[in-house]
Amino acid sequence: MFTYNSRGELVGDQLRPGGRFGYQYDNIGNRKEAFEFGSTTDYETDELNRYAGIVRNGGEAFTPQYDADGNQTLVKTSTGIWEVTYNAENRPVKFESEDGGTTVECAYDSMGRRFEKKVTVGGTTGFHARYLYRDYLQVAECDLTGETPEVVRSYIWDPSEPEATRVLSMTRWEANGTQEKEHLYCMDDAMKNVTSLFGEARGRRALYEYRPYGGLITSEGNMGEENGFRFSSEYMDGELGLVYHSVHRYQFV
């Protein structure tokens, strides 16, 4: 059950017994406090309405950093602290972990769509993908780690909602995209969040539950990690703990 204040801001959510969420804001909508599963996070803002300090359960404060354009260049997510580099169009092109061991690089086309992502851990490329689009909907993913690109996944979207739509199914491919490995079908809620994946013969393959602003509470099943489309039917970058929005860039959860 969601509760809102007079300005339409979310102030409470009773997900389940013991699963209460609460939020407080200042007069212009900046979050001041978050209460989630018994944990309290306090936020401090600067004169430009940017978060200047974040303290969890009274511990050490994390201080975000920004460039001259207001892009956040030092971020803290569920996977750690990342230093972010942006291109001239203010799109994030490189994420480097605090210890320098992991680098995530992104490339964009002339329409601002991310068409490539490369993850390097300890100097070794562990993930390298190219994304294919129909307008702003990702319809296929190619693996670039081998000598030749191979189609590994394709997606079907709800045609009744051409813009703010939801993913309906995923096909996994093998033999360089010439043979279907399996079809997986998505179940979603009223907010377009993918809540589960089902196979044709093997039952439920993934189950997800979310916090009010997109953080994962539950991720179960042998396809729980491989499936990228989760909160709001947007792509989850598991390495970064961030949701990639094709139009709105990254949402910090």
Report the location of each language-model feature.
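A short glycine-rich beta-turn/N-cap micro-motif
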Residues: 1-12, 19, 24-34, 45-53, ...
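Asp/Glu-centered strand-loop micro-motifs enriched in Gly/Pro and often flanked by an aromatic residue
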Residues: 59, 76, 96-98, 120, ...
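Short loop/turn microsegments at loop-to-beta-strand junctions
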Residues: 1, 20-21, 39-41, 60-62, ...
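A contiguous, low-structure linker/loop signature
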Residues: 136, 142-155
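Extracellular/periplasmic catalytic domains that process cell-envelope and extracellular macromolecules
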Residues: 125, 132, 148-149, 159-163, ...
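A motif-centric feature for acidic-aromatic and gly/ser/thr-rich catalytic loops and repeats
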Residues: 33, 37, 41-45, 174-247
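Glycine-centered tight beta-turn/hairpin loop motif at sheet-sheet or coil-to-beta transitions
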Residues: 16-18, 36-38, 57-59, 77-79, ...
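Short beta-turn/strand-loop junction motif enriched in small, turn-promoting residues
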Residues: 71, 80, 120-122, 172-175, ...
